C-alpha cells in the first residue's frame, strides 16, 4: 500500500498517541513505509508541501528530532524555518500564548513544537489556525518517537502483535516511555517496564504493564529491549546512588541481554549515555536497531506531515 492509498488520517493535529485509534496508527505506519522507500532513492523529494511553510519551534535543545523534522519537511517540498528560542522573544518574557499569536500572524501551515512543560503543545494548538505536531512536551508524550519505534520493530519482526517489549530505565521522566506504552499496547504487544522504584511512576500498573524492579527477571523472554536515557537534567533529588551503581543493576550489557530471547533486538531513542544505561558493545552490536531508528525517524515525520497536509486548505 502506498502513501497515496493509505487510509485517510482523521486528525488535524498530532498531539499525542493517546486518542489515536489502531487504524489511525496503522495508517501513519503505512505512509511511513512508503517514505522509507522514497528516502532510499537517489531523488528523495516529493511536492506534497510545496508552497507550504513549516515552523520548527523548540523550547528544549534537540539535535536529532529537530533535524529529522527539518529534513522531513524539506523532502516534502516545504519551506522550513527553525525558530531559535534562545534568541527569541520567549527568552525576553513573552508568554506561550503571545508566541502562538505571533506565529499565527505569520500564517504558517504547520508548527512542530517541543516544550519542557506537559500540555504546552495542546495549549498552543488551541491558539493557532494551522496544524500542530507535538515533538515532545515535558514528561507527557513524544508521539513521533513511538511511531518510529513501532515502524522499526514492525520492519524487523514482521509485526508487533504478540511481542513482549521491555522498556527499561528512567521511566518516570520519559515521554518516550508513555507514548510507547500506549502505542505498543494498541498494536497488541505485551509491555513490561523495568527500573528502580525511584524511577518508576506511582501507579504505572494502571496502564496495563508488567512492572519489574529486577532487570534480570524483567528481561526474561523479551523480544525487544528498549533502553531509556537517564535524564539527570530533570532530576532535582537523588534518584540513583551513582552512575556506576546504576549501570551495574540497570545498564544493558551482554550478560543481561542474554536473558532475553536469542533473537531479541535492542533499541534506544537517543541520545545514549554509553556506560550508563547501555554498554558500547551492545549499542553497536548485531542486535542493535539504534541506527535504523534514526532512519525511520525521518520517514515517520514525513508520514505525519503528509497526513496532516490533507487537512490544510486545498491540501
UniProtKB/Swiss-Prot annotation:
GO aspect biological process, one term: 'de novo' pyrimidine nucleobase biosynthetic process
UniProt xrefs under Pfam families: OTCace, OTCace_N
Pathway: Pyrimidine metabolism; UMP biosynthesis via de novo pathway; (S)-dihydroorotate from bicarbonate: step 2/3
Gene3D superfamilies: Aspartate/ornithine carbamoyltransferase
Binding positions for carbamoyl phosphate per the UniProt entry: 64-65, 114, 142, 145, 270-271
Keywords: Pyrimidine biosynthesis, Transferase
Signal peptide coordinates: none
EC number: 2.1.3.2
One GO MF term: amino acid binding
EC primary class: transferase
Catalyzed reactions per annotation: carbamoyl phosphate + L-aspartate = N-carbamoyl-L-aspartate + phosphate + H(+)
A single Gene Ontology CC term: cytosol
Keyword DNA repair: no
InterPro entries in alphabetical order: Asp/Orn_carbamoyltranf_P-bd, Asp/Orn_carbamoylTrfase, Asp/Orn_carbamoylTrfase_sf, Asp_carbamoyltransf, Asp_carbamoyltransf_Asp/Orn-bd
Binding-site positions, L-aspartate: 92, 175, 229
HAMAP family, sorted: Asp_carb_tr
Complexes and interactors: Heterododecamer (2C3:3R2) of six catalytic PyrB chains organized as two trimers (C3), and six regulatory PyrI chains organized as three dimers (R2).
Described function: Catalyzes the condensation of carbamoyl phosphate and aspartate to form carbamoyl aspartate and inorganic phosphate, the committed step in the de novo pyrimidine nucleotide biosynthesis pathway.
Family assignment from sequence similarity: Belongs to the aspartate/ornithine carbamoyltransferase superfamily. ATCase family.
Protein name: Aspartate carbamoyltransferase catalytic subunit
Source organism of this protein record: Methylorubrum populi (strain ATCC BAA-705 / NCIMB 13946 / BJ001)
Gene: pyrB
